[in-house]
From Swiss-Prot:
Residues 117-132 have a biased composition (Basic residues). It comes from Sorangium cellulosum (strain So ce56). Gene3D superfamilies: Nucleic acid-binding proteins. SUPFAM superfamilies: Nucleic acid-binding proteins (SSF50249). Belongs to the universal ribosomal protein uS12 family. This is Small ribosomal subunit protein uS12.
Length: 132
């Protein structure tokens, strides 16, 4: 425990802030190229095949990114836009692909409906407004 005179001379070191998405380097999004597109299984209580891709960003960093929505058209060498935001049940996945930009098409929507269009939360999945 320092004395008051020691604190006056030296001061305390400010706590360093640790960013949740370091590969973005203080940018809202980054462009990258898919190196590998694959599926992974989530952590213990959940069970699924989550669609993810390994992306080499424009700043030469390589990150794992989640592909949201139902169905996608991404493959190796697809150019994608990456935003921050982790997936809680996939360890090491701290980024999301932005749907509806660059090579990532908008999501098709829930397959349970007979017409495969997404009418709600469209902006999250890059889906255009339906005609009527």
């Amino acid at each position: 425990m320092p004395t008051i005179s020691q604190l006056i001379r030296q001061g305390r070191e400010a706590a360093r802030y640790k960013t949740a998405s370091p590969a973005l380097k203080s940018c809202p999004q980054r462009r990258g190229v898919c190196v590998r597109v694959y599926t992974t299984t989530p952590k213990k209580p959940n069970s699924a095949l989550r669609k993810v891709c390994r992306v080499r960003l424009s700043n030469q960093m390589e990150v794992t990114s989640y592909i949201p929505g139902e169905g996608h058209n991404l493959q190796e060498h697809s150019v994608v836009l990456i935003r921050g935001g982790r997936v809680k049940d996939l360890p090491g996945v701290r980024y999301h692909v932005v749907r509806g930009t660059l090579d990532a098409s908008g999501a098709a929507g829930p397959s349970s409906t007979n017409k495969a269009t997404r009418n709600r939360k469209r902006s999250k999945y890059g889906v255009k407004r339906p005609k009527a």
